[in-house]
């Protein structure tokens, strides 16, 4: 009897993180999917305050977070509780079976000093060449970020700014921080700032060190729930080569002109659920990536991705595939999502050396208003227009071509877009696409589809203002 009681206590000491029932999202799907496994977190609790943390907005908490994670790790895992306050920090590296829990009014602010965001190479003893994502995990199992608090990426200390994307007042405010202008004087770089040191020898080299806010690599059983993510230096969250990922009920917000300010990017992951999120981003809203070229093929596809009940306000695209997806896209369901004020709604973008093949993509019941450009767009010559980029003029080897196929859209409702459907590509790049039972109200043109693009429209109604 005693042994049975001990066994029961051990079982109950592990709690499935915020054990919400997600089964309703897996009913009546057009493809078979496995519901992601939630992380199992031991019922141990450590407060950041117990480990020297201080939420006064002045104290650096990097060591306190590391100490708390180490303490929980020795206990087999548990919940790292962050109470109300402002916690300045550098890197937070999660370990197995740990939940980073932000209580209401808890704000984690990433340090303005870029040096706080680099790991030291254990072999050379020198700083790594690129900053590490502020909250990171690699090859971990059962990890989560939960709660009602906020993570502020302090992105303006990292991101370059294009003059064309800010007002006169904003431009003066950036220059008041110090910084450096490019030769043309139309791009501001956060290099040679008044109050923070450089981390590279010039502005271009420093720009290459910029990285994401949250990145999980090769992890299993991941949950991000409830928190608010603000103003990342680059992408806000990007699980990469992960399995069993749930992103539920988070808010992502950054300036509309934030360079590379993607909200949620999923890269070569399997069994993913993205639900109930609210996004207002500087770049893509919910984006699927699968690597470029041979590296993308090795990483594998995005597979079994379920995206429902999300709202996207500003973004370059509400739902996006690409630009790099050489590993492929397989079994993706996007339904019951709203896009209001995005540049494009459903965006499929890629190019030579970045492309792959899509399979079993189903998009249903999408509601869009005030779309700046095309409601639905296919681009196969996409140019990654990062700051200072120049289009390549030399011939490119014709490999890893985009193959957008087997994409099925239905019940797409659009009130306000410049172009309804736009598709450009050579023969074989955009084909076997169906759009059914949809209404599109446009202001410029209903369709702009190349003859080589094979898109079947069934019961699609286009309307515009009377002329």
Residue map of PLM features:
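Right-handed parallel beta-helix
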Residues: 104-105, 141-149, 220-230, 243-255, ...
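Short, small-residue-enriched loops and turns at beta-alpha junctions
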Residues: 54-56, 293-297, 327-328, 354
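Conserved short loop/turn motifs at secondary-structure junctions
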Residues: 82-89, 263-265, 351-352
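Active-site-proximal loop/turn and secondary-structure-junction residues that shape catalytic pockets
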Residues: 86, 241-243, 251, 270, ...
